[in-house]
Amino acid sequence: MRKEKSLGLAAEMRTLAEASREAARALSHADPRRKDAALRAAAEAIGRREKRILSENARDVAAARAAGQNAAYLDRLKLDPKRLAGIAAALHEIAGLRDPVGEVTASWRRPNGLEIRKVRIPLGVVLMVYEARPNVTVDAAALCLKSGNAAILRPGSDALRSSLALAAAFAEGLEKAGLPAASAQVVPTPDREATYELLALDDLIDLAIPRGGPSLIRAVAERSRVPVLKHYQGVCHLYLDASAPPQQAVDLALNGKVQRPGVCNATECLLVHRGAAGKLLPPVGRALADAGVELRCDPTALTILKRAGVAAVPARPDDFGKEFLDRILAVRVVADLDGALDHIARYGSLHTEAIVTRDLASARRFQREVDASAVMVNASTRFNDGGELGLGAEIGISTTKLHAFGPMGLAELTTQKFLVEGEGHVR
């Protein structure tokens, strides 16, 4: 019986992927105005379907709460009228971005007279595998559509009802613009085997993008025959150098940890130069503790904070290198900049790293030597975001160096081909 079910699921996923492949072919040369019209119509459909979408989301949230998920997880899953309006606004924003398809990125003429151009083209079919983030369903569908790609969307089971309701609104936009319904498809089953069946279809799917925790990333990378571009965890560090201005240190630590702790560019570890720890740690620690952050400290940091009357607890062995996604922060005192660089090299996840310093030489060395998709100097880790960096909307933040590194916007959802023109040239 299990084998029959598996064969049925495999056939279902192949049929779904084949429809996506056909849609991708049509999207590769679709009129940009038609794609933009679909996005705007989808935004309007979300507004009209608000009651239905929020009702389905409430069912998802209730089930996740009953399953014992934590507050940060529930926050990522939850939709409300304001967040839904933000999703619709993002569709209008994406519609207003420049279409990357067909953009000439370079051109030259060879001595033999050949005219050569490099132009952007869609990747094809993109499989997006993600956890309980309903907004990703729409963001990924929209960015793939704008860049001429078909999207197969595989949300976590906790967000399936919400995602199907949002996808129905998106499908309405596609229909109104006369684009293929299979341009954006949500995998309709919570069965994990469906993901594995899709990951085997390297003849139909061009790229898989897993976005979530370590177990999700590992499962996709280990089982996939499709090229994988990882959007891995964000173990983001904030290093306070010896010359860090105390108030700036407080502001950046608070913003990085407290503003939205459940996202991948939140600060997860605070490193402090030993020579300034006595001056910097008490005000920074007090501000964080007052904001409800649990400080998990190495012995030196713990002693300094306890002496200053700031609530803190000893760090556990695995707290360094951990993505908490909650109001928890690992804290360590390091000898100097070398110590900070060594710590980040060992525990960082190639996502975002930040330094607070007045010393230009320290800032430049930090920028040179830290291996991450974004390196911040006197700025919060929260700025590693497509919109904040001026790239427009993003499908996620890649921690894989091939084919894109950092926020993935429209350009990163394309590849390039050569167009060569001659006059009967032979070699």
Curated annotation (Swiss-Prot):
Keywords: Amino-acid biosynthesis, Cytoplasm, NADP, Oxidoreductase, Proline biosynthesis
Pathway(s) the chain acts in: Amino-acid biosynthesis; L-proline biosynthesis; L-glutamate 5-semialdehyde from L-glutamate: step 2/2
E.C. number(s) listed in UniProt: 1.2.1.41
GO molecular function, one term: glutamate-5-semialdehyde dehydrogenase activity
GO biological process, one term: L-proline biosynthetic process
Reactions performed catalytically: L-glutamate 5-semialdehyde + phosphate + NADP(+) = L-glutamyl 5-phosphate + NADPH + H(+)
Pfam families: Aldedh
SUPFAM superfamilies: ALDH-like
Residue ranges crossing the lipid bilayer per the database entry: none
Localization of this protein: Cytoplasm
A GO cellular component entry from the record: cytoplasm
Xref: PANTHER family: DELTA-1-PYRROLINE-5-CARBOXYLATE SYNTHASE (PTHR11063:SF8), GLUTAMATE SEMIALDEHYDE DEHYDROGENASE (PTHR11063)
HAMAP family reported for this sequence: ProA (MF_00412)
Physiological role: Catalyzes the NADPH-dependent reduction of L-glutamate 5-phosphate into L-glutamate 5-semialdehyde and phosphate. The product spontaneously undergoes cyclization to form 1-pyrroline-5-carboxylate.
Family per record: Belongs to the gamma-glutamyl phosphate reductase family.
Protein name: Gamma-glutamyl phosphate reductase
Organism from which the protein derives: Anaeromyxobacter sp. (strain K)
Protein's gene: proA
